[in-house]
Curated annotation (Swiss-Prot):
Keywords: Metal-binding, Ribonucleoprotein, Ribosomal protein, RNA-binding, rRNA-binding, Zinc. HAMAP family: Ribosomal_uS14_2_B. Binds 16S rRNA, required for the assembly of 30S particles and may also be responsible for determining the conformation of the 16S rRNA at the A site. This is Small ribosomal subunit protein uS14. Zn(2+) binds at C24, C27, C40, C43. GO terms for cellular component: cytoplasm; small ribosomal subunit. The gene is rpsZ. It comes from Alkaliphilus oremlandii (strain OhILAs) (Clostridium oremlandii (strain OhILAs)).
Amino acid sequence: MAKTSLKVKQQRTQKYQTREYSRCKICGRPHAYLRKFGICRICFRELAYKGQIPGVKKASW
C-alpha cells in the first residue's frame, strides 16, 4: 500500500522542478535508478540475466 501511494504521489506534477524524482518503471524503487534504461539496478540485473535487454551481456575479464 505504501509503495502504491508513493507511485501515485510521484506522478502528480510538482510545484517546483527540483522536487521531481525518477522511479523504476517496474518496481517503483527511487534509489539506484539507471536513467538510460529507466529501471533500478536490481531490475536491470534480473532482466540482463534473462537476456531481455538488447545489447547487454555479462562482462568478464
